Amino acid sequence: MATATSGTGKTKVAVIGSGNIGTDLMIKILRTSEVLEIAAMVGIDAESDGLARARRLKVATTHEGIDGLLRMPEFDDIEIVFDATSAGAHARNDELLRARGRRVIDLTPAAIGPYVVPPVNLDAHLDAPNINMVTCGGQATIPIVAAVNAVTPVAYAEIVASIASKSAGPGTRANIDEFTETTASAIEKVGGAARGKAIIVLNPAEPPLVMRDTVYCLIGASDQATQDAVVASVTRMVDRVREYVPGYRLKQQVQIEEASADDPLRQLAPDGSEPAKVTVFLEVTGAAHYLPAYAGNLDIMTSAALRAGERLAQTLTQREGATA
């Protein structure tokens, strides 16, 4: 289908899911995007705050889910749909949208399409009908794994994502198992680690703490030149993520130490190597567009999805112009 743009030249999109993530994404599009225009907000609870806020902001809404979206007059002009529902609901949403030629950006752990982490592999998947934004923990940590792997192979990577309990809505809590499985898989497929593991911690502390992530990478070289190159690569990657998530930062300097002889992780390193452990501590503060600043886990997810949506829209518009 031809790219549908508004009178301002923006590509029209819809958001399915009127919870925390969907609502924050809607507001980001409204306030910050020079490329996208939100044409519809979709939920299943007519009284949800997300739909109520959308109505106040003059965004067309439906509380009848995907079926309601397909019946909306605005649907004909929508080119890209962001799905912020759940892994279970996404399969049907994707089937119906793909059959109608819409591109889908999946913010659930369903992972029907390829995993996408913008600074690592977005451009490689711009032709995919469905792309998956992994998880909040994945968006925060996989760029670091990829940065280390760009210098020297990562034999094992483990990430620990600690988020404020208050920032985890019912969707996040219902998908905890999918979170760990999806993130671990993407650590390998996108980050490049030979083996990956993910752990999520819901921190009940009051007042709520911002998102904090720890990334451990086991590498097969501990010489100074490799260490210096790893630190430089990680620093560059942090700067790239900060382009679209300003609250993303290194909490401490990158730490690299030789793996001791009795370290159980040493057996995962290549035979004959002098393995080292790279440890990176991250902190993510949210932009507070809709959610509190401590909800950096949600902010990095919606910011990554927005980045992907804008890049996809630009690509579609360029191709349309080239064939006009």
UniProtKB/Swiss-Prot annotation:
GO MF: acetaldehyde dehydrogenase (acetylating) activity; NAD binding
Catalytic residues identified in the record: 136 (acyl-thioester intermediate)
Catalytic activity, as annotated: acetaldehyde + NAD(+) + CoA = acetyl-CoA + NADH + H(+)
EC numbers, comma separated: 1.2.1.10
SMART domains per UniProt: Semialdhyde_dh
Entry annotated with the keyword Metal-binding: no
Binding site for NAD(+): 18-21, 167-175, 297
Pfam family name, one: Semialdhyde_dh
Keywords for the protein's UniProt record, in alphabetical order: Aromatic hydrocarbons catabolism, NAD, Oxidoreductase
Highest taxon listed in the record's lineage: Bacteria
Enzyme class: oxidoreductase
Family, per entry: Belongs to the acetaldehyde dehydrogenase family.
UniProt name for this protein: Acetaldehyde dehydrogenase 1
